[in-house]
Swiss-Prot record:
Example GO biological process: regulation of DNA replication
Functional description taken from the UniProt entry: This protein is an auxiliary protein of DNA polymerase delta and is involved in the control of eukaryotic DNA replication by increasing the polymerase's processibility during elongation of the leading strand.
Location relative to the cell: Nucleus
HAMAP family noted in UniProt: DNApol_clamp_arch (MF_00317)
DNA-binding region: 61-80
Gene3D superfamilies: 3.70.10.10
The protein's name: Proliferating cell nuclear antigen
Species name: Sarcophaga crassipalpis
Pfam families listed in its UniProt record: PCNA_C, PCNA_N
SUBUNIT field: Homotrimer. Forms a complex with activator 1 heteropentamer in the presence of ATP.
Gene Ontology CC: PCNA complex
Stated family: Belongs to the PCNA family.
């Protein structure tokens, strides 16, 4: 038997909004330590990874490891039926071919449940090697989302250049060019407004804007985003989910003569 409960449906809605554009279907791997999801996007360019710790749930029970393949579009439709302040419970029997979502109103006067068929998905689990990154940038997630959105107007690709002076985002195309430079914040009252750069050596890499913009769908989950970069290694874009876990996106840099 698997059962996981969150007091507030909003967080699960936000998590799904963060991954459903990139991943159409995925397997939720449930164990006593929590829920893991890892899947390549449909064009096999980027990887999405979700970790939700069992101790972050209001209630969590997993008698044996269970893999639940789900269509994320269908799951999003079901979650749309929940009010933001509903308690949401996800349940599945061992070896079941369906999963149940139960929504309960705060006053316990309304309870609704939705059953969804599970899918058998053939997904390999990719080992992600531990990497010592040359540059790690922490910055406000809304600022990163805005930069990705703005620079995508100029080009399909965005250059991220990290030095000890700061981090620079650039794009150039037929219309013209755009540059946004952020210096490390010297003093900041609110931690979530800080720009913090940890640099071992300078890095300049180019990435496809459309994937970066897809990653920023996770912005509502976290006030800060962390970008980890190293030459010839996929970029890691990480959003922490407070007291519950994190979402990480991996995107390989574009090669100079790569037109894709």
């Amino acid at each position: 038997m698997f059962e996981a409960r969150l007091i507030n449906a909003t967080i699960l809605k936000k998590i799904l909004d963060a991954i459903k554009e990139l991943l159409h279907e995925a397997t939720f791997e449930c164990s006593e330590s929590g829920i893991q999801l890892q899947a390549m996007d449909n064009s096999h360019v980027s990887l999405g990874s979700l970790t939700l710790r069992s101790d972050g749930f209001d209630k969590f029970r997993c008698d044996r490891n269970i893999s639940m393949g789900m269509n994320l579009g269908s799951m999003a439709k079901i979650l749309k039926c929940a009010n933001n302040d509903d308690t949401v419970t996800v349940k599945a029997q061992d070896n079941a071919d369906t999963v149940t979502f139960m929504f309960e109103s705060p006053n316990h006067e309304k309870v609704s449940d939705y059953e969804m068929k599970l899918m058998n998905l053939d997904q390999e689990h990719l080992g992600i090697p531990e990497t010592d990154y040359s540059c790690v940038v922490r910055m406000p997630s809304m600022e990163f989302a805005r930069i990705c959105r703005d620079l995508a107007q100029f080009s399909e690709s965005m250059l991220i250049c990290c030095t000890k002076e700061g981090v620079k985002f650039s794009a150039s195309g037929d219309v013209g060019s755009a540059n946004v430079k952020l210096a490390q914040t010297s003093s900041v009252d609110k931690e979530e407004e800080a720009v913090i750069i940890e640099m071992q050596e300078p890095v300049t890499l180019t990435f496809a804007c459309r994937y970066l913009n897809a990653f920023t769908k996770a912005t509502p989950l976290s006030a800060q985003v962390q970008l980890s970069m190293c030459a010839d290694v996929p970029l890691v874009v990480e959003y922490a989910i407070k007291e519950l876990g994190h979402i990480r996106y991996y995107l390989a840099p574009k090669i100079e003569d790569d037109e894709s």
